[in-house]
UniProtKB/Swiss-Prot annotation:
Species in which this protein is naturally found: Haemophilus influenzae (strain ATCC 51907 / DSM 11121 / KW20 / Rd)
Gene3D superfamilies: 3.40.1370.10
Result of altering residue 82 to I: In strain: S54; confers macrolide resistance
Oligomeric form and interacting partners: Part of the 50S ribosomal subunit.
GO cellular component: ribonucleoprotein complex; ribosome
Domain of life (superkingdom): Bacteria
Pfam families xref list: Ribosomal_L4 (PF00573)
SUPFAM superfamilies listed in its UniProt record: Ribosomal protein L4
GO biological process: DNA-templated transcription termination; regulation of translation; response to antibiotic; translation
Primary role: One of the primary rRNA binding proteins, this protein initially binds near the 5'-end of the 23S rRNA. It is important during the early stages of 50S assembly. It makes multiple contacts with different domains of the 23S rRNA in the assembled 50S subunit and ribosome. Protein L4 is a both a transcriptional repressor and a translational repressor protein. It regulates transcription of the S10 operon (to which L4 belongs) by causing premature termination of transcription within the S10 leader. L4 controls the translation of the S10 operon by binding to its mRNA.
Protein name: Large ribosomal subunit protein uL4
GO function terms (MF aspect): rRNA binding; structural constituent of ribosome
Length: 200
């Protein structure tokens, strides 16, 4: 199959990478796993056993007229322990390489079908100027975009840093969430070739 390149000849690409059927269930599983892996999971509270304080009974069991109490670390006391204390958790989910690559291929194929993948010969800036980048995107009739290049161009990265709806990644930095988060995905010819090599 062929991908149209802006201002250049069409690029022949592999149908297994850019012409794959849309697999919603697989994409959902991989996106959920990716988001789960990004969770910090470091929350921690103390149970009554872990709270610092005496284990002595505050007053005798009977005869005072007060409610019975075992120690000052009881969860119903101020500064006592937490009943079901949260502990650090690993939220990551296992996704094997075949599934991950399949999801990326499925997303790329759907971007092609929806005309959301814009292929350009090259995409670089002479200086880190946001104004120049905005104009370049206007020329492509794009506002909300993920820009994928073969290697990270520092000028491009710095120019895009101040734009809320624009992100710049190299091929190694793409992930399923960022691919579906933007209206358009601008990708260079060299980046397309790299993606094909990685996903082959």
């Amino acid at each position: 199959m062929e991908l149209q390149v802006v201002g250049a000849n069409a690029l022949t690409v592999s149908e297994t990478t850019f012409g794959r059927e849309f697999n919603e269930a697989l994409i959902h599983q991989v996106v959920v796993a990716y988001a789960a892996g990004a969770r910090q999971g470091t929350r921690a509270q103390k149970t009554r056993a872990e709270v610092s304080g005496s284990g002595k009974k505050p007053w005798r069991q009977k005869g005072t007229g007060r409610a019975r109490a075992g120690d000052i670390k009881s969860p119903i006391w101020r500064s006592g322990g937490t009943t079901f204390a949260a502990k650090p958790q690993d939220h990551s989910q296992k996704v094997n390489k075949k599934m991950y690559r399949g999801a990326i291929k499925s997303i790329l194929s759907e971007l092609v079908r929806q005309d959301r993948l814009v292929v350009v010969e090259k995409f670089e800036l002479d200086a880190p100027k946001t104004k120049v980048l905005v104009q370049k995107l206007k020329d492509l009739a794009v506002e909300d975009a993920l820009i994928i290049t073969a290697s990270l161009d520092e000028n491009l990265f710095l120019a895009a840093r101040n734009l809320y709806k624009v992100d710049v990644r190299d091929v190694q930095g793409i992930d399923p969430v960022s691919l579906i988060a933007f209206d358009k995905v601008i990708v260079t010819v060299d980046a397309v070739k790299q993606i094909e090599e990685i996903l082959a």
